[in-house]
Amino acid sequence: MAEPLTESQPPQPPAPLRPPNNASALEEVAERADTVWTRGSGKSPRTRVSAKSELKGSRGRVAIVDGCRTPFIKSGTDFRNMDVIDLASVAASELVARTAIDPELIDLSVFGVVVPALHAPNLGREVVFRTSLPMNIPGVTVNLACASSTRAIAFGAEAILTGEADIVLAGGAESLSNVPIQFSRKAAQTFMELSRAKTLPQRMATLSKLRPKDLAPVAPAIAEYTTGQSMGESAEKMAKENDISRRAQDEIALLSHQRAAAATADGRLTAQIAPAFPPPGYDKPVTADNGVRADSSLEALAKLKPAFDKRYGTLTAGNSSPLTDGGSAVLLMSEERAKALGYTPLGYIRSYAFTALNPGDQLLQGPAYAAPAALDAAGVKLSDIDLVEMHEAFASQILSNMKAFASKKFAKEELGRSEPVGVVDFDRFNVTGGSISIGHPFGATGARVVTQLLYELRRRGQNLGLVTVCAAGGVGFSMVVERE
């Protein structure tokens, strides 16, 4: 029985909807899929699909020639003196050098960022300047939360398919070490009024309106504007509503660290990384992600306290992705142009889909709707996919979407299908680690996921891959890529 509230006790979050279970991650997905939450309305969220058949234009498919990224570094550490332009430019410069592309051939620069630099908000254009590309290359910036760089890739693909461009530099970056800190609205309005004051008495009179409390900085909140809930609170809600155990979440986190550690040790991940030389010294290279823990264990993860719901919660710092700084980039071309220039691309975009749902329902469940749409557009099934790369914002979000994939109830009530999308095979899932271990710079993660998937498909000699990304605002993204 719940303890009675006293005057010294704050109101507590609601208790879990069901008694807590201790299912493993495999059991959650393979045996308990139908405990996933559905709205019961029978009406699916709106989904936008790239094409109803294989994505191809007059000059062939859209080729992803290569991709790379900076190390992904926990905010406030090695990259604290690098802004978002620095990070995007490190990845872009390295990519241009690796591919030996003639900069004069690049038609467009498209980059995603969630928290842009206030002094230079058009990141796509600033990358052109910072990487010494020709000044006549247009630069565009997009913000689709955690799906920003996948949206940048999609915009680049669309530019190629419509003939606007032949070659596009796309990617994203985030510097959460350098998030702009705001003043209160009253302070901001007073400063604006002060800038218009012409005499000393006018300035003094304006300043006299301020009180010390007005000058307190306002820290940015990683929360939904429409619901007021933070990402973590939303993911905690998903864990409860989808009846996901703490054990299963910790198992996903452990898998992420173990696989990322192995892929770092054998060079699979470091091959994709551009070394960075952060200021002020510019003399100490940063060459690897600093969030990967090779010594992680279920026992250590189980000792961590809940982070968002202190009383009933199952989300911890260990099974959630950390705030991270980093940049990423990919080089896109029409298939025809890639062949003419002698490139062997990493792969090709076969289809993609975006979806949007009510953020007050299950904020990060978008991939459960976007993935089946992308698979249908590509003309394939989940069982045809060789590797699955899912962005790990939180382990609860991963398991929620996996359960939706496998659930007959979800398929019928949410997707209008007679059969579920399918059970994700853990042996084909995030095989070189994911965002929980590697890190999650919001604007850079999408391009990292796409590149990481294609590198591993190439190494294994496999063909088809599926990318999924959840994002703030109830957005979901999915892409099918192919190597042949």
Can you name each region flagged by the protein language model?
Residues P19-E54, G60, C68-T70, R80-V90, ...:
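N-terminal extracellular/periplasmic Venus flytrap/periplasmic-binding protein-like
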Residues P20-N22, A33, M82, V113-V168, ...:
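Conserved catalytic cysteine-centered active-site region
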Residues A117-L123, K284-A288, N358-P367, E392-K412, ...:
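Short glycine/threonine-rich loop-to-helix capping motif typified by GTGT followed
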Residues V142-E174, Q182, A239-R268, A329-E336, ...:
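Active-site-proximal alpha-helical scaffold in enzymes
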Residues I167-K237:
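Flexible glycine-/small-residue-enriched beta->alpha junction loops
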